[in-house]
From Swiss-Prot:
Gene Ontology cellular component annotations, sorted alphabetically: anaphase-promoting complex; nucleus
GO biological process: anaphase-promoting complex-dependent catabolic process; cell division; protein branched polyubiquitination; protein K11-linked ubiquitination; protein K48-linked ubiquitination; regulation of mitotic metaphase/anaphase transition
Compartments in which it is found: Nucleus
Record cross-link Glycyl lysine isopeptide (Lys-Gly) (interchain with G-Cter in SUMO2), residues: K772, K797
Subunit structure, interactors included: The mammalian APC/C is composed at least of 14 distinct subunits ANAPC1, ANAPC2, CDC27/APC3, ANAPC4, ANAPC5, CDC16/APC6, ANAPC7, CDC23/APC8, ANAPC10, ANAPC11, CDC26/APC12, ANAPC13, ANAPC15 and ANAPC16 that assemble into a complex of at least 19 chains with a combined molecular mass of around 1.2 MDa; APC/C interacts with FZR1 and FBXO5. In the context of the APC/C complex, directly interacts with UBE2S. Interacts with FBXO43.
Pathway(s) where this gene product acts: Protein modification; protein ubiquitination
One of the record's GO molecular function terms: protein phosphatase binding
Residue list for modification Phosphoserine: S757, S758, S777, S779
Location of the region described as Disordered in the Swiss-Prot/TrEMBL record: 755-788
Name of the protein in question: Anaphase-promoting complex subunit 4
Keywords annotated in UniProt: Cell cycle, Cell division, Isopeptide bond, Mitosis, Nucleus, Phosphoprotein, Ubl conjugation, Ubl conjugation pathway
UniProt biased composition (Basic and acidic residues): 770-785
Phosphoprotein keyword on record: yes
């Protein structure tokens, strides 16, 4: 006979799903009811709590990468960062839609990341946070990029939205910490610009956490040898960041503005290149064929020049014009090329120049900050390096202005050439030519001759490029991302200012004049500018990184399990920073008597301060259900644990004596029970932190916890991993097959659950007690209703759970 409980078990199932791909990482949004998942195919998914509904998917691709290794949310929940091992890239993705807002490359594959919001308050910081950014008042708003280009990123192309502000987020400093192999650790302000590179840590980072007061960085690493891994805990002091927090915040804000502007300039150039390739494609498709098939030995230039001078075309040229181009096609080609030129011109004037001027403004402000040596010299900000960066931006602006002159000249020549050729073709077809088209001044003839000389002059340097038989157009050479010199550099002969500069050694080396590179492309000068800016802003990262010294090293354990890729990706051991009490917590397990015992290591974020009960072990003794109807006593092994909030840890246990399908338990462990002030002296660790902790397992003070509530049997599920979110009061449990997920509301008791107290009857009958609502027959339903009528105090609880999900 079935027995039903007189009390409700904890936690309510609010969603359950079987996913098509294995999940290797999951992270709850810190502000919203969203959970981000990464699977084995390299896809990043965003799901909503309600019914585990998918919001969007960021598919893997060649440019970003296909091997996701970790995820992290920005503290405001508006950006999601994820790392890709194959391309060594970090992608910052908008939570509203699966689009990359920003990306950057790192030197090593990233194995873990953590995004910290700085909570330190001061009057200086408050005034900075509340003050309006002067750049918004002094600089014009950047024009949005045109949407009709296939740019890899759609950032800066949204109307009525300031993408830079969305990317930068709140003024309050937040820092993205990245960890990888060979002790690779880097810190990025606002998730965008590197402000520190840490050295001196051995092994691969498997967990890290920067304290919100910026006083220390906790790192867990593993060093693999002979099939086993030794896992150690490090704590690094970050006093320079803490001591100069207002200066670091101001400097980092400038860095991120500069980083966003460089991205804006890059995307503007990408749009210009696409417009140029449209011109090249139009010209190549019509003229290259003519050159290849032309049986005569005369050049294209000679053919057109003959037509210009004598008004007669050769049979071959006439065939090209009448059959391949046609009058209508020529008119359309001319309009298309003119439109593309106008697009490039507009992008240079409104996008490149405005972006460069904004860049110049922020670098000039940064130079002013660097001049205040008392405040910014300890952070490595170098005024001389910033001056070099300003000079490089000036050179880029000069090259952009040169391109504008070339575009203006080319457009005049293009218009004159197509107008003349259009009239010539009308005469060939004996069509009527309008009087205004017939008028051709000497200046027009000069423009046509210049066009023929510049664009149809055979250039051997172009043989291996597009338009290889002739120099199709002069603008394109400025947009080639190559180190080669320009094929047709601007003619500086007779330029009095240029000659004057070349003959004056004093002016040529003057810091007041920006260097000019007449034989280099715009792309080359842009790359040089980026390198100089990167070099100038790299010094603070080196200086701050060197200041972060290792203060504590605690060897934890040796464990073959750490070699398991999936386990590593799911963040266990787990680090947590309690922002209220300024404590670092580390959750890990030690093997003891064939059971994995959970241990909690805690350290103060201030290295100079100690904390009581620095190391404590947790054993799980008994679980009472149905108002002490029955007590579950067994030997429980900790599979996974994560902090739910500052006061609670969510744990998944495995009952070593339990039957398959009823051997996993979800538990909410309150730290107030672990750190009991009444008997805290009895639980002080008396061993040595310099000796590996698993070798001192017998002397680690251990509490045995007994639970009457805040636990739940996870039936029909081989639960293995958990991710909790105390703000939204939810936890997500993932099975060992990495596909089956179940979501619980943690502060609501479930009203539809059969009591676990009937284990004995279950085993005796050989059938599970779990009643599935969807398969109850009418007779069974009536029988249960009759039973309830006989005893009104008995409540039948039915839950929709699918035991096949975990198969």
């Amino acid at each position: 006979m079935l027995r039903f409980p007189t009390c409700f078990p904890s936690f309510r199932v609010v969603g359950e799903k079987q996913l098509p791909q294995e999940i290797i990482f999951l992270a709850w949004s810190p502000k919203r009811d969203l959970i981000a998942l990464a699977n084995t195919t390299g896809e990043v998914l965003l799901h909503r709590l309600a019914s585990f509904h998918r919001v969007w998917s960021f598919p893997p691709n060649e440019s970003t990468g296909k091997e996701v290794t970790c995820l992290a949310w920005r503290p405001d929940g508006k950006l999601l960062a994820f790392a890709l091992a194959d391309t060594k890239k970090i992608i910052l993705c908008d939570v509203e839609k699966p689009e990359s807002l920003h990306s950057f490359s790192v030197e090593a594959p990233v194995s873990c990341m953590h995004w910290t919001e700085v909570t330190v308050e001061s009057s200086v910081l408050t005034s900075f946070y509340n003050a309006e950014d002067e750049s918004n008042l002094l600089l014009p708003k950047l024009p949005t990029l045109p949407k009709n280009y296939n740019s890899t990123s759609k950032i800066f192309s949204e109307e009525n939205s300031d993408e830079i502000i969305k990317l930068l987020g709140d003024v309050r400093l937040n820092i993205l910490v990245l960890g990888g192999s060979s002790g690779f650790i880097e810190l990025y302000a606002y998730g965008m610009f590197k402000i520190a590179r840490v050295t001196g840590i051995a092994g691969t980072c498997i967990a890290l956490c920067l304290s919100s007061d910026l006083k220390s960085l906790s790192v867990v690493t593993e060093v693999s040898s002979g099939g086993e891994s030794e896992v150690s805990y490090f704590q690094l002091e970050t006093n320079l960041l803490y001591s100069f927090l207002p200066e670091v915040t101001r400097m980092a804000r400038k860095f991120t503005h500069i980083s966003a502007l460089l991205q804006y300039i890059n995307l503007s150039l990408t749009c210009m290149c696409e417009a140029w390739e449209e011109i090249l494609m139009q010209m190549d498709s019509r003229l290259t064929k003519f050159v290849q098939e032309k049986p005569t030995t005369t050049s294209v230039q000679d053919e057109f020049m003959h037509l210009l001078l004598w008004g007669k075309a050769s049979a071959e040229l006439q065939t090209l014009l009448m059959n391949q181009l046609t009058v209508k096609g020529l008119k359309k080609l001319g309009q298309s090329i003119e439109s593309s030129y106008s697009s490039i011109q507009k992008l240079v004037i409104s996008h490149l120049q405005s972006g460069s001027e904004s860049l110049l403004y922020h670098l000039s402000e940064l130079k002013g900050m660097a001049s205040w040596k008392q405040k910014y010299e300890p952070l490595g900000l170098d005024a001389a390096g910033i001056e070099d960066a300003i000079t490089a931006v000036g050179s880029f602006i000069l090259k952009a202005n040169e391109l504008l002159q070339v575009i203006d000249s080319s457009m005049k020549n293009f218009k004159a050439f197509f107008r003349w050729l259009y009239v010539a073709m009308l005469r060939m077809t004996e069509d009527h030519v309008l009087p205004e088209l017939n008028k051709m001044t000497q200046k027009d003839i000069t423009f046509v001759a210049e066009f023929l000389t510049e664009h149809f002059n055979e250039a051997p340097d172009l043989y291996n490029r597009k338009g290889k038989y002739f120099n199709v157009e002069r603008v394109g050479q400025y947009l080639k991302d190559e180190d080669d010199d320009l094929v047709s550099p601007p003619n500086t002969e007779g330029n009095q200012w240029y000659d004057f500069l070349q003959n004056s050694t004093h002016l040529k080396e003057s810091p007041l004049l920006f260097p000019y590179y007449p034989r280099k492309s715009l792309h080359f000068v842009k790359r040089r500018m980026e390198n100089v800016i990167d070099q100038c802003l790299q010094k603070p990262a080196d200086v701050i990184g060197r200041s972060m010294n290792q203060a504590i090293c605690i060897p934890l354990y040796k464990d073959a399990r750490s070699m398991d890729c999936a386990r590593r990706l799911l963040k266990f051991p787990f680090l947590w920073n309690n922002k209220t009490s300024n404590l670092h917590y580390l959750l890990f397990t030690i093997l003891e008597d064939s059971v994995y015992k959970m241990c909690i290591l805690r350290r103060h974020t201030d290295i100079s301060q100690s904390v009581s009960n620095g190391l404590i072990g947790i054993k799980f003794g008994s679980f009472t259900s149905a108002s002490a109807d029955k007590v579950r006593r067994s030997s429980y092994s900790c599979l996974d644990a994560q902090f739910y909030d500052d006061e609670t840890v969510t744990v998944i246990l495995k009952d070593s004596m339990g039957r398959e399908g009823r051997d996993r338990i979800l538990v909410q462990l309150s730290l107030s029970l672990v750190y009991n002030s009444e008997d805290s002296d009895e639980y002080e660790f008396t061993g040595s932190y310099s000796t590996r902790l698993d070798e001192q397992g017998s002397i680690i003070p251990t509490r045995t916890m007994h639970f009457e509530k805040h636990w739940r049997l996870l039936e029909s599920m081989r639960a293995q991993y958990v991710a909790g979110n105390g703000l939204r009061k939810v936890s997500c449990v993932l099975s060992s097959n990495l596909r089956h997920v179940r979501v619980f509301e943690m502060d609501i008791d479930d009203e539809w659950e059969i009591d676990e107290s009937s284990d004995d009857e279950e085993e005796a009958g050989g059938k599970p007690v779990k009643i599935k609502e969807e398969v109850l027959s009418e007779s069974e339903t009536e029988a249960h209703q009759d039973a309830a009528a006989l005893d009104p105090d008995v409540v039948i609880k039915v839950e929709k759970l699918d035991p096949e999900l975990d198969s």
